[in-house]
Every structure is written in C-alpha cells, then in structure tokens.
Amino acid sequence: MTARLQEFYKEKVVPELIKQFGYKSVMEVPRITKITLNMGLGEAINDKKVIEHATGDLIKIAGQKPIVTKARKAIAGFKIRQGYPIGTMVTLRGQRMYEFLDRFITVSLPRVRDFRGVSGKAFDGRGNYNIGVKEQIIFPEIEYDKIDALRGLNISITTTAKNDEEAKALLNAFKFPFRN
C-alpha cells in the first residue's frame, strides 16, 4: 500500500510539472529523494538525559530510530570534546518520507502559532528546501504533558530538481503553504 502523497505525485504532480516545464521524459521530473530531521542539542554537554528525551521525540515524530550525532572536533569555547553527543538526526526515504510530508503539511504546519505560511526563500540554490521548527509540540505525536523542554528541529527536504524554481513548483504541487 503506497502513501497518499506518493499516489498524488504519480497521478497529478508529474503530469502537471511535465506540462509546466516541458520535460521529455518522466524521469526528468523532479522528485523528493529524502527528508532529514535534525535536532542540534548544545545543552546535551551538561545533561546526558537531554539526548534520550530528544531521541524519544524524534522516534515519535519520524517513526524510526534516529542516530546520535557526535562532535567531529573539540571546540574549547563551547566546552565540546571530540566524540561528544551533540544532536540527533533521522533520514526518511520512500513511503515513510511521503507519510511524514503528508502529516507535516496537513496537520503540523497549521498548528504553528501565528502561522502565515513558510518562507519561499529557504531554498539552497540546488533545489533543496530547509525549514526550521521552533517547537516540537506542533507534531500531534508529541504529548505536551510528557515533554521535558521545548526543542526546535531542522527539516531538510532534498529533491532532484536542478534549480530553486523547479523545486518550488514541485513543493507547490504538493500544496506546500508558501507565503511568498
């Protein structure tokens, strides 16, 4: 059973983008390859439980176990030694990716306080989109009573688009709520 957004991509988005950009092959049409959720935890230096709580939150949000990212080199100013755990990240591909994107667009983004749409300028020049979430409680899987602290996370959407214009058209076709 494929995800709802995956079927929507094949049936509606691909023909729409072929018509808009004049692609000759279906394989030329940009698609989302992966979504990476990253939670940087600077406060984990003092308290090791922070990593456990953040990992638990990401498991609930993504539906799979994240990896703990470690410091590549020591930075005395931040009191970090090489190998210290400083964050968690999870990479979603395939069906889980489409299911997460569906939940994110339809349920989570409207729950953001004072939400007026996401910025259309957060593309990196190579067709990838980044969005920062200030609080993990916008996700319905996170119970407000059971969190220890509000943490933000970075969501990176990687596409096969050659430029930002194609990537924005792809995300617009997925009904991504851009404000500009």
From Swiss-Prot:
GO MF annotation, one: rRNA binding
A biological process from GO: translation
SUPFAM superfamilies: RL5-like (SSF55282)
GO CC terms of this entry: ribonucleoprotein complex; ribosome
The keyword Transcription is annotated on this UniProt entry: no
The keyword RNA-binding is assigned to this record: yes
Keywords annotated in UniProt: Ribonucleoprotein, Ribosomal protein, RNA-binding, rRNA-binding, tRNA-binding
Lineage: superkingdom: Bacteria
Pfam families, A to Z: Ribosomal_L5 (PF00281), Ribosomal_L5_C (PF00673)
Family, per entry: Belongs to the universal ribosomal protein uL5 family.
Subunit structure: Part of the 50S ribosomal subunit; part of the 5S rRNA/L5/L18/L25 subcomplex. Contacts the 5S rRNA and the P site tRNA. Forms a bridge to the 30S subunit in the 70S ribosome.
Role this protein plays: This is one of the proteins that bind and probably mediate the attachment of the 5S RNA into the large ribosomal subunit, where it forms part of the central protuberance. In the 70S ribosome it contacts protein S13 of the 30S subunit (bridge B1b), connecting the 2 subunits; this bridge is implicated in subunit movement. Contacts the P site tRNA; the 5S rRNA and some of its associated proteins might help stabilize positioning of ribosome-bound tRNAs.
Name under which the protein is recorded: Large ribosomal subunit protein uL5
Organism: Ralstonia pickettii (strain 12J)
Taxonomic path: Bacteria, Pseudomonadati, Pseudomonadota, Betaproteobacteria, Burkholderiales
